[in-house]
């Protein structure tokens, strides 16, 4: 099974691909979308969960999403049509790091997709190329709450702690105007949902080759989370504006 399919199945019951509740997502979007008529871009949109919420909450917003997964984009398009917002959503099958647009955006999102750019600061650099003057960037990325094991670093990356993460963002020329640190409940709910949704899909197909493969992937992920990074990993979402210019 390819990783894109595994990710789609794992997020079936938690379409926001980050450890955030619906209420946390709503607050973050409300802090980034201030007028209600913004052009919004999501770099690494997956199934479009962030954009669907933005469009549903703000009838004047138009949005564009970029992702490398055709399957995820198809899901986003179908969900947008079902919600009656498809006419305000444009989807691009493209590498988010290489995407370009002729018009700037008032809000640029990239939550949980820093790996596509090579880290948090490169993500901000990419977002800035699409950002209109005075616009907002909403990013979400991991940090270490505690000293990580070597295995955890190998799995997830060499993050900083929370103060250093925010300091790096500020030193890069950005000012946080809002933020959210995911709670233990949000972090655990996300991981239980990820592994549980994938495992449930697999158990319903226990006699099929993909069923066994998916069940093994869910089991491996659950073990790595519980043993290697549950105590150390944290997640922060930041709403940012350029400090000058």
Question: Which residues fall in each region the model found?
Answer:
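Conserved alpha-helix/loop element of class I SAM-dependent methyltransferases that forms part
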Residues: 18-36
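Conserved class I S-adenosyl-L-methionine
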Residues: 37-46
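Class I SAM-dependent methyltransferase SAM/SAH-binding core
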Residues: 49-97
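A short acidic, Gly/Pro-enriched loop at the edge of an enzyme's catalytic core
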Residues: 97-108
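A short SAM/SAH-binding and catalytic strip from SAM-dependent methyltransferases
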Residues: 107-120
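A short glycine-rich, Lys/Arg-flanked "PGG" loop and its adjoining helix->strand segment in the class I
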Residues: 121-136
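Short, glycine-/aromatic-enriched active-site segment of Class I SAM-dependent methyltransferases
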Residues: 139-157
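Conserved Class I S-adenosyl-L-methionine
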Residues: 180-245
């Amino acid at each position: 099974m390819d990783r894109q399919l595994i990710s789609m199945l794992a997020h079936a019951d938690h379409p926001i691909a980050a450890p955030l509740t619906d209420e946390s997502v709503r607050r973050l979007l409300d802090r980034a979308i201030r007028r209600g008529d913004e052009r919004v871009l999501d770099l690494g949109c997956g199934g479009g969960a962030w954009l669907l919420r933005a469009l549903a909450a703000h009838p004047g917003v138009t949005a564009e999403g970029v992702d490398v997964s055709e399957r995820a984009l198809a899901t986003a398009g179908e969900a947008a049509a079902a919600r009656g917002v498809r006419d305000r959503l444009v989807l691009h099958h493209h590498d988010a790091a290489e995407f370009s647009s002729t018009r700037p955006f008032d809000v640029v999102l990239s939550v949980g997709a820093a790996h596509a750019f090579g880290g948090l600061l490169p993500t901000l650099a990419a977002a800035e190329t699409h950002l209109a003057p005075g616009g907002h960037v909403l990013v979400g990325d991991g940090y270490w709450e505690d000293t990580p094991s070597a295995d955890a670093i190998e799995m997830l990356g060499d993050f900083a702690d929370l103060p250093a993460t925010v300091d790096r963002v500020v030193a890069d020329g950005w000012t946080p105007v809002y933020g959210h640190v995911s709670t233990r409940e949000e972090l655990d709910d996300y991981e239980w949902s990820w592994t549980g949704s994938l495992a449930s899909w697999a158990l319903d197909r226990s006699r099929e080759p993909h069923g066994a493969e998916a069940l093994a992937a869910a089991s491996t992920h659950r073990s790595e989370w519980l043993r290697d990074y549950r105590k150390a990993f944290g997640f922060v979402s930041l709403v940012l504006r350029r400090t000058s210019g």
